Amino acid sequence: MSEISNIINEPIGDRMKRFEAKYDFKIEPQNYFCVRLDGNKFSNFTRKFEKPYDVRFSQAMVMTTIDTINKFGARTGFTQSDEITLIFDKAIPDDFKKHITYNHLFNGRVSKLLSIVSSYVSVRFNHHFRLLTSNLTNIYSQETLELINGGTAIFDARILEFDENNKYEMLNHLIWRSVKDCYRNAVQTYAHHIFGPAKIKYLNREQMIQLIEENTNIVWSNIPLWQKYGVIIKKQLIKTDNVKNSVITSSFKVFSLKLSYNDTMLKFLFDKYFELDKISEYQLEDYPLSII
């Protein structure tokens, strides 16, 4: 009876906050983190889109990633297929001042980050994709357009946190999503589209590529990098000189490359702005699709 009395005497707000606190994890300000977002049940959503790649779907994903970097201050964005990865630097800078308190976005609260970022991505993707496909009845069926216009596409999200000693795993994570997963999907997507599932069921990637090149006019090395390795997005500064002075504005660099592990690329991921000379050893390919 005394325990019940204590509960009753505790303000209801405090009591509810105790229950909420059970899952109120925080990312430490000295740590790095990334948010990876995936389309929820997108295999059904994209079933009747253009094959092997729907360029408007890709554009919508890129534009959504740009919006999300702009909104939440991620250092680097990556997108392939129906997923987006956002890379965030540590909150405490190297030249920190002792009298200043540093925190991540939303004070590093994981529940806030997951819910707000996934909500924002869902809203922006539906907005962009609806605009890009508006009235394209020659490409999409009425049923598909109604599905797109319904704006019901949603994304889930997960967070990966890395301390200073594991910072390198951020690049490994991106290599996994790009060089491994995206590349595998590209090979399978083309092979499945051209030959169907039965003919490629027991083939490995090299055999699928050989089959494609021997039976079509496709040269695998000519396939766009954005299809094979996904798209990387970073802010960049643009200097414009006029008669009176120089003006510096910011825009976004949207490009693709084949990632590999080295310290140069790891540092590049956390740089605030894109600078070509910092990754000059890589072969870059600008994203070829017009971004409206």
Swiss-Prot record:
Q: InterPro entries in the record, alphabetically?
A: tRNAHis_GuaTrfase_cat, tRNAHis_GuaTrfase_Thg1, tRNAHis_GuaTrfase_Thg1_sf
Record protein name field: Uncharacterized protein R259
Q: Which GO molecular function annotation, any one, does this entry have? A: tRNA guanylyltransferase activity
**Pfam families in the record:** Thg1
Q: Which domain of life is it from?
A: Viruses
Q: Which organism is it from?
A: Acanthamoeba polyphaga mimivirus (APMV)
GO biological process: what's one of them? tRNA modification
